[in-house]
UniProtKB/Swiss-Prot annotation:
It comes from the Viruses. To E.coli ylcG. InterPro entries: YlcG-like. This is Uncharacterized protein in rusA 3'region. It comes from Enterobacteria phage 82 (Bacteriophage 82).
Amino acid sequence: MMFEFYMAELLRHRWGRLRLYRFPGSVLTDYRILKNYAKTLKGAAA
């Protein structure tokens, strides 16, 4: 339970920080952020 909360907060913080440097409100930007983050998680697990 605590791990999921931590990961959600980490993702929320990272997402907010990344959006500062990109065009806000863009769905494609959100998709790119999530896709790249998923890649880093997959690489860390391997």
